[in-house]
Amino acid sequence: MESVLSKYEDQITIFTDYLEEYPDTDELVWILGKQHLLKTEKSKLLSDISARLWFTYRRKFSPIGGTGPSSDAGWGCMLRCGQMMLAQALICRHLGRDWSWEKQKEQPKEYQRILQCFLDRKDCCYSIHQMAQMGVGEGKSIGEWFGPNTVAQVLKKLALFDEWNSLAVYVSMDNTVVIEDIKKMCRVLPLSADTAGDRPPDSLTASNQSKGTSAYCSAWKPLLLIVPLRLGINQINPVYVDAFKECFKMPQSLGALGGKPNNAYYFIGFLGDELIFLDPHTTQTFVDTEENGTVNDQTFHCLQSPQRMNILNLDPSVALGFFCKEEKDFDNWCSLVQKEILKENLRMFELVQKHPSHWPPFVPPAKPEVTTTGAEFIDSTEQLEEFDLEEDFEILSV
């Protein structure tokens, strides 16, 4: 009983220290599209931050590829940040942005299933094993440090094998987001006997839409949108600061990947000119499923004070993330970008309606033909030959 009380008191101390570290100010804190008034809502702020899934270095997992490393300490921080961004997208997809986590409280089955996607086992679809081995197809050796764009490309390819979450992952190119390409990728016909074939001709679709019918009404595949950027040469250009902060205010925000060379962080919000981030640079022991099939999640939530960094100390190479569960969410995001991002004289990125004529034709990514199922698809790097090697756009200097 004393040990239980001691543990509880220690937790109270952590929370108190956390709350006292934030200044008594009237400024708003923005966390992934939600605002908190620091002076009166510190406990809500704590609850919101601690609800984010926190992935860190792990040790004592099965060797990657059978003979590779059994810990990602020292090299896996950007992969862990990518996991955190994707996990937030899955939380929004299945549980909603307003879902909250409480320690030792029974959680929805969807939460447990999301968590199991990221366990450090080769049969988990977004495990460190799968990400590291998929990185080989992006020119990265297992155990080599990744940049944000490489992680984005890896997530895009792994998502093709993830039928349960069924995400469309779009990674922008040349600082440009193309609306036409995203809608082509995300609009899918309902799976039925009548609509399982090819998409109807444009003329027929337009005709039905004009009549207000739903005979060929398309469904929307939830979108994970990642925008890799370079916001300066050696340091972030101050002209981008306001636009960068605006992205954390958008309801579609998944935060940003970035940090400093060889030190990746997952940025989830800001207070004034300070960015708030979750730090993966803590090495914890591998956690597996228990006998009842659940995962002990106590080490997957950060109950200590998240760190802060002045935005001007951020390395200029970053990747923004956004989640659009429905088409209306994407349309709203486009409106916000046009209002808040494109108004700047020096734009952080471009949003265009049509596919640029000088680009290669856009082909929505498709699952390669490999004779495996689900998350078990990569057992060796030989299978990576099914993927085309994309140009490596490393955006954090090593």
UniProtKB/Swiss-Prot annotation:
It comes from Homo sapiens (Human). One of its GO terms (biological process) is autophagosome assembly. Inhibited by N-ethylmaleimide. Redox-regulated during autophagy since reducing conditions activate ATG4A whereas an oxidizing environment such as the presence of H(2)O(2) inhibits its activity. GO terms for molecular function: cysteine-type endopeptidase activity; cysteine-type peptidase activity; protein-phosphatidylethanolamide deconjugating activity. Its main location: cytoplasm. The active site is at C77, D279, H281. InterPro entries: ATG4_LIR, Papain-like_cys_pep_sf, Peptidase_C54, Peptidase_C54_cat. A motif (LIR) lies at residues 393-396. Signal peptide: none annotated. The LIR motif (LC3-interacting region) is required for the interaction with the ATG8 family proteins. Required for proteolytic activation and delipidation of ATG8 proteins. It is found in: Cytoplasm. Keywords: Autophagy, Cytoplasm, Hydrolase, Lipid metabolism, Protease, Protein transport, Thiol protease, Transport, Ubl conjugation pathway. Belongs to the peptidase C54 family. It catalyses: [protein]-C-terminal L-amino acid-glycyl-phosphatidylethanolamide + H2O = [protein]-C-terminal L-amino acid-glycine + a 1,2-diacyl-sn-glycero-3-phosphoethanolamine. Pfam families: ATG4_LIR (PF20166), Peptidase_C54 (PF03416). This is Cysteine protease ATG4A. Interacts with ATG9A; the interaction is direct. SUPFAM superfamilies: Cysteine proteinases (SSF54001). PANTHER family: CYSTEINE PROTEASE ATG4, CYSTEINE PROTEASE ATG4A. Its EC number is 3.4.22.-. It is an enzyme of class 3 (hydrolase). Cysteine protease that plays a key role in autophagy by mediating both proteolytic activation and delipidation of ATG8 family proteins. The protease activity is required for proteolytic activation of ATG8 family proteins: cleaves the C-terminal amino acid of ATG8 proteins to reveal a C-terminal glycine. Exposure of the glycine at the C-terminus is essential for ATG8 proteins conjugation to phosphatidylethanolamine (PE) and insertion to membranes, which is necessary for autophagy. Preferred substrate is GABARAPL2 followed by MAP1LC3A and GABARAP. GO terms for cellular component: cytoplasm.
